[in-house]
């Protein structure tokens, strides 16, 4: 994702209507994240996520509370962030497919391990034969 816009995601616990968590991502490092709002609301300092595969960095902060009146818009209102629709449910079964392992990659890793073991055995055998030749 090139030049992502700052966004705030609100996550709610389906079993408890009191627990709410806000994830604030992709904001500029000059934006000041509020430290505390009220008792019962916890806000982390901003954290830099270094994504070396994409050669980019992303800032993130988390706020959570057990109060029913807690909303993400109140916490991060000065940040000019977008608030994606909360109508889309977070389904863990949809994300599992992207985390499946690749069979070819597993086979290649196994092949490399086998070749390393074979190389170690050959080097050990050569060393043993060389020492035996020197001793006689």
From Swiss-Prot:
InterPro entries of this UniProt entry? Ig-like_dom_sf, Ig-like_fold, TCR_alpha_C
Q: Where is the Ig-like C1-type domain?
A: 19-103
Q: Which SUPFAM superfamilies match?
A: Immunoglobulin
Q: Subcellular localization, per the record? A: Cell membrane
What cystine pairs are annotated?
Answer: 22-72
* Keyword tags: Adaptive immunity, Cell membrane, Disulfide bond, Glycoprotein, Immunity, Membrane, Receptor, T cell receptor, Transmembrane, Transmembrane helix
* Gene Ontology process terms (BP): adaptive immune response
Region Connecting peptide, residue ranges: 90-111
Q: Which sites carry carbohydrate?
A: 66, 80, 109
The answer to whether keyword Membrane applies is: yes
| Domain writeup | The connecting peptide (CP) domain contributes to the TR-CD3 assembly and signal transduction.
The protein depicted here goes by the name T-cell receptor alpha chain constant
Q: What is the species listed in this Swiss-Prot or TrEMBL entry?
A: Mus musculus (Mouse)
Gene it is expressed from = Trac
């Amino acid at each position: 994702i090139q030049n992502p816009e700052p966004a705030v995601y609100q996550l709610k616990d389906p079993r408890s209507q009191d627990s709410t968590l806000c994830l604030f991502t992709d904001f500029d490092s000059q934006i000041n994240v509020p430290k505390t709002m009220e008792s019962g609301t916890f806000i982390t300092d901003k954290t830099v996520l270094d994504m070396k595969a994409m050669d980019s960095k992303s800032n993130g902060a988390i706020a959570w509370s057990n109060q029913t009146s807690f909303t993400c818009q109140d916490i991060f209102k000065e940040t000019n962030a977008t608030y994606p629709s909360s109508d889309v449910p977070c389904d863990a079964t949809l994300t599992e497919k992207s985390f499946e392992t690749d069979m070819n990659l597993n086979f290649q890793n196994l092949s490399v391990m086998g070749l390393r073991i074979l190389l170690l055995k050959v080097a050990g055998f050569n060393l043993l034969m060389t020492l035996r030749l020197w001793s006689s």
